[in-house]
UniProtKB/Swiss-Prot annotation:
Species whose genome carries this gene: Trichlorobacter lovleyi (strain ATCC BAA-1151 / DSM 17278 / SZ)
Record-given protein name: Large ribosomal subunit protein uL18
GO biological process, one term: translation
SUPFAM superfamilies according to UniProt: Translational machinery components
Lineage: Bacteria, Pseudomonadati, Thermodesulfobacteriota, Desulfuromonadia, Geobacterales
GO molecular function (one): 5S rRNA binding
Length: 122
């Protein structure tokens, strides 16, 4: 079995600490972000009902482009704009941002800024 790196353990501790304070409702869902080496994913989650209201990622058809590297800030900004577009179609204007233990920097910040510019309020 492989060992979990100290960096991952620290991120998971931050995730638990943030998750204790942040919950999403139907009126103001939680905008959850997950970042991997090659992709970035965003979901709008209603924690009361336990359902995902909307999702977008660099794997989604409208966002992904063939032959383009998706592990960069430009792709993260495209995902932020896409999740905001889907949220506004479902009359969701205000969300709670859950960075999922990742530092608010780089691709996470680019996604959040693009979602704000596209009309989400958080």
């Amino acid at each position: 079995m492989g060992k979990t790196s100290q960096k991952t353990i620290t991120r998971l501790k931050r995730q638990v600490r943030v998750r204790k304070k942040v919950t999403g409702t139907a009126e103001r869902p939680r905008l959850n972000v997950f970042r991997s080496a090659n992709h970035i994913y965003a979901q709008l989650i209603d924690d009361v009902q336990g359902v995902t209201l909307a999702a977008a990622s660099t794997c989604t058809e409208g966002v992904a482009q063939s032959g383009v590297h998706t592990g960069n800030k430009a792709s993260a900004a495209a995902v932020g704009a896409a999740i905001a577009r889907v949220a506004l179609q479902k009359d969701i204007r205000s969300v709670v941002f859950d960075r999922n233990g990742f530092l608010y920097h780089g691709r996470i910040q680019a996604l959040a800024d693009a979602a704000r510019e596209a009309g989400l309020d958080f």
